[in-house]
């Protein structure tokens, strides 16, 4: 399986809200960084953040995906969430995924924080 295929499977797990599969894809020492926010280190902390969002629906749409010769995968996405209380969040994102032994060891998502906070208000 290529790292591109791993990322697509990871996104599919998010879309199914299969949190066990999301967790399985992460390295124990993963670094997860939503660039406008604080960096999160470790699988337990990453999963705490992820499940703490409590979405009622997830639909990440991949616009473009590419893998370089080092196996780093870059995604251009629109991450859509149905949030509690009927709120809808649609966030354009550029994401970078790095791998160690087939698991995501670094994940950085770049997005506009104002777009996020305005939709969550």
What are these language model-derived features?
Residues 1-121:
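C-terminal and inter-domain tail/linker signature
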